[in-house]
Each structure stands twice: as structure tokens, then as C-alpha cells.
């Protein structure tokens, strides 16, 4: 969380001269999955960002003592259309920058459809899909979590170091899961480890016997 707080503070400092910052204060947005599969994680993530904003605001040193106001919005983690609508609400409300989103799919959608077209900086604390590296962000999108292009390689190295000879891979059927699975699969194969199957699965099912059977 310390890295997140520092990163948020830095990007606030760099963006407050944006023309959307009015004479009375600076509007910031936080968009995370307050509902959906990671709703138990996001309150602490949001609170840490709000702490950074508060420290900057209370310092009295931000653009001659400007104050920061923060608005939260729900990315849902899984519904890109809803996430885009929520992000549009933040921007139309005057947010000059956004902390978020969280899950890779909604993060990419917000970056490409809202943040970049409107010239609004966004910084994700958790989106790790390798595909986000290649989006045409024009310098407006950042993330503090490492790409799965690195994480998948590390997992493959650990698999090799433990002497594993074959693996079966199943992954959450979304941008995050597929990105990590693709990197891991290629990396373990490069280590000479056999991949017996690669299968997607949906979250929250009552029974995964069909996936296990493959």
C-alpha cells in the first residue's frame, strides 16, 4: 500500500495544473470494484488512495494550498460497459485524474474509451494483463503492479526449480486469467516442461469436475 500511496501522490502533483482543476479545488476520481468478485479487497485500496489525497490536500503546499475532493465510482471488476459509464461520470464531474481501475478487462476499457480520449491520467494499482502494455495510451495510463509478462515467467521459474515435469493449466476466463496463462504456458514449455492441457473456467461455479476431467 505504501507504493500505491506514493504513486498516487506523484501523479496528483503532476496533473493538478490540468485545465479541469478549477479555482476552488482539484477533483480526483477513484474507480474500483466496490461490487463484484473483489469487493472485499477494494475498500482498503480506496482508503489508501484517499489517505494520499488527504495528505496532499492538508499539506497546504499543493498549488498554493488547493484542496482535493475525491469521488468514488464502481468498476464492478467484470462489466466493462458499466465501468466505462462509471468512469465517464467521474470525468464529466470534473475529475482531472483517476486512481483505478482494478481488474484488467475493465481497466483497459476505461483507458481506451474514457481516460485517453479525454486526456485524463489514470493509474491502476492492480491490473496486470500483458495486453495493457500495448494499448495506445498516449502517456495517460500507468500501473504500479508488474505485468503478468513478468509474473508468469517467475511462476514458470519456480515450477522448474521444484522439479515439476508436467503441468495442467486452468485459468479464470477473463483478460487477466488468459494473459497470465499464456505467459506461464509459454515459459514452462521453454523450460522443457510438458503442458498437458490449458482450459478456461468461469468463477463462482458450484462444480468444476468438467474442467478437472480435462
Give the residues covered by each predicted segment.
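Short, solvent-exposed loop/turn and secondary-structure capping segments
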Residues: 40-43, 83, 110-111, 134-135
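Extracytoplasmic "Venus flytrap"
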Residues: 29-50, 73-80, 102, 170-178
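Short, conserved glycine- and acidic-residue-centered signature motifs
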Residues: 21, 42-45, 148
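Extracytoplasmic ligand/sensor domains, especially the bilobed periplasmic-binding protein
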Residues: 92-199
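Structural motif
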Residues: 66-92, 151-154, 200-214
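Short, low-complexity disordered leader/linker segments with a strong preference
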Residues: 1-27, 58
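Immediate post-signal peptide segment of exported/extracytoplasmic ligand-binding proteins
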Residues: 20-30, 61-69, 159-165
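Signal peptide-proximal N-terminal region
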Residues: 47-70, 189-193
Amino acid at each position: 500500500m505504501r507504493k500505491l500511496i506514493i504513486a498516487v501522490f506523484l501523479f496528483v502533483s503532476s496533473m493538478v495544473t490540468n485545465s479541469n482543476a478549477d479555482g476552488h479545488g482539484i477533483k480526483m476520481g477513484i474507480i474500483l470494484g466496490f461490487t463484484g468478485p473483489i469487493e472485499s479487497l477494494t475498500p482498503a485500496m480506496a482508503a489508501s488512495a484517499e489517505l494520499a489525497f488527504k495528505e496532499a490536500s492538508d499539506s497546504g503546499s499543493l498549488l498554493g494550498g488547493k484542496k482535493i475532493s475525491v469521488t468514488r465510482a464502481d468498476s464492478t471488476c467484470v462489466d466493462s460497459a458499466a465501468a466505462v459509464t462509471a468512469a465517464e461520470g467521474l470525468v464529466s464531474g470534473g475529475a482531472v485524474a483517476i486512481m483505478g481501475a482494478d481488474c484488467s478487462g475493465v481497466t483497459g476499457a476505461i483507458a481506451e474509451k474514457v481516460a485517453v480520449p479525454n486526456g485524463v491520467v489514470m493509474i491502476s494499482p492492480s491490473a496486470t494483463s500483458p495486453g495493457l502494455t500495448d494499448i495506445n495510451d498516449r502517456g495517460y495510463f500507468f500501473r504500479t503492479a508488474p505485468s503478468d509478462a513478468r509474473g508468469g515467467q517467475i511462476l514458470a521459474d519456480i515450477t522448474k526449480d521444484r522439479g515439476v515435469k508436467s503441468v495442467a493449466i486452468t485459468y479464470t476466463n477473463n483478460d487477466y486469467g488468459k494473459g497470465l496463462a499464456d505467459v506461464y504456458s509459454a515459459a514452462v514449455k521453454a523450460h522443457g516442461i510438458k503442458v498437458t492441457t490449458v482450459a478456461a473456467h468461469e468463477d463462482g461455479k458450484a462444480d468444476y469436475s468438467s474442467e478437472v476431467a480435462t
